[in-house]
């Protein structure tokens, strides 16, 4: 199995998103998968122009000369694609959205009806058709309900290009990852172990079970403790900056 992860955080390898992606890929590797981790912030990805050249004049090929053609090639060669992003304004990061907008060369412009009678695009052969997606996201909020829009967004996107979501990892209290606190270290280590197990499960079974996803969504620390600590952190830093 070949797995490629696309990290849409502007912080790249220093991101809280990477703190989840890294152990996930490690777990997949121990089960025999070949993995690659791509930081989108390090690539030249320009916005879609909406010109439809990739649908009409050069089917399957974008007119923009940047890094997207190579990234699409990597996606086409993978069995599983991991979309990893921090939660920004209830959705994906701007970097990730720009990347996703540029996936339209992978679809044929013609419509057809799915099994529920809803229009979708015909997938272009040899690109993304029938790929499996894993979604990884983290946020600074305390409740998992904040991922409702993002969760639906990726499921709808997968449906429209004839792919399917086979695993989801949504992590609240994400700002705990960079903290260096003795009492917190074993909690984060245990969480990373569970993420590694999810990576192994994906390779061994082809998916991440709902039970595994639910366990990974459990709070790292009590919500009241997290919210209080976060507010004190902001107060301290705002005061130090003289605001």
Task: Identify the residue ranges that each predicted region occupies.
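N-terminal beta1-alpha1-beta2 submodule of the flavodoxin-like/Rossmannoid cofactor-binding fold
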Residues: 1-111, 159, 166, 185-243
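A short acidic, helix-capping loop that chelates divalent metal ions and anchors anionic groups
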Residues: 176-180
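Beta-strand-loop-alpha "switch" segments that mediate conformational coupling across diverse proteins
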Residues: 166-174
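A generic secondary-structure micro-motif detector
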Residues: 14, 61, 143-144, 171
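Short, solvent-exposed loop/turn segments at secondary-structure boundaries
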Residues: 15-16, 145-148, 181-182
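Short, glycine-/small-residue-rich phosphate/pyrophosphate-handling segment
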Residues: 94-95, 107-161
């Amino acid at each position: 199995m070949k797995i490629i992860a696309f990290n849409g955080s502007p912080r790249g390898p220093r991101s809280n998103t990477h703190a989840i992606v890294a152990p996930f890929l490690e777990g997949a590797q121990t089960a025999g998968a070949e993995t690659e981790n791509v930081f989108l912030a390090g690539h030249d990805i320009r916005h879609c122009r909406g010109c439809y050249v990739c649908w009409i004049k050069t089917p399957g090929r974008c007119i923009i000369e940047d890094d997207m053609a190579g990234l699409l090639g990597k996606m086409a060669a993978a069995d599983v694609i991991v979309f990893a992003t921090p939660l920004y304004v209830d959705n994906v990061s701007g970097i990730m959205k720009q990347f996703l907008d540029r996936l339209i060369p992978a679809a044929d412009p013609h419509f057809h009806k799915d099994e529920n009678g809803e229009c979708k695009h015909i997938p272009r052969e040899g690109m993304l058709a029938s790929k499996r997606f894993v979604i990884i996201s983290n946020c600074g909020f305390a409740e998992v309900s904040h991922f409702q829009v993002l969760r639906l967004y990726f499921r709808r996107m997968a449906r429209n290009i004839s792919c399917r979501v086979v695993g989801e990892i949504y992590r609240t209290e994400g700002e705990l990852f960079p903290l260096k606190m003795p009492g917190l270290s074993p909690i984060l280590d245990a969480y990373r172990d569970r993420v590694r197990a999810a990576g192994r499960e994906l390779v061994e079974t082809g998916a991440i079970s709902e039970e595994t996803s639910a366990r990974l969504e459990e709070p790292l620390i009590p919500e009241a403790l997290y919210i209080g600590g976060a507010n004190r952190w902001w107060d301290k830093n705002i005061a130090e900056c003289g605001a």
